[in-house]
């Protein structure tokens, strides 16, 4: 299993319940596979460096996971079809 650093940004117009629901859904991808979330941080609502889809702010989330490639591919697929995610990045350490 390899380590991956993942960060994603959610739309700023979501309420706390929606944000929690989306985070739980995205993290559940790794609980279904043999993986471990080593570290995670809810950075919160921050200004974006430039507007994305007419949004100037976003909810930032970051975590490091140790998992297999299959779980990362599934996360990538899900995050691409989740409308609330406006930007994400996955880095293999």
Swiss-Prot record:
A biological process term (GO) from this entry: translation
Entries under CDD domains matching the protein: bS6
Cellular component GO terms held in the UniProt record: cytoplasm; ribonucleoprotein complex; ribosome
Keywords: Ribonucleoprotein, Ribosomal protein, RNA-binding, rRNA-binding
PROSITE patterns reported for this sequence: RIBOSOMAL_S6
Presence of the UniProt keyword NADP in the record: no
Domain of life: Bacteria
Annotated SUPFAM superfamilies: Ribosomal protein S6
Entry's Gene Ontology molecular function annotations: small ribosomal subunit rRNA binding; structural constituent of ribosome
One Pfam family per UniProt: Ribosomal_S6
NCBIfam families: S6
Protein function: Binds together with bS18 to 16S ribosomal RNA.
Similarity annotation: Belongs to the bacterial ribosomal protein bS6 family.
Name of protein: Small ribosomal subunit protein bS6
Designated gene of the protein: rpsF
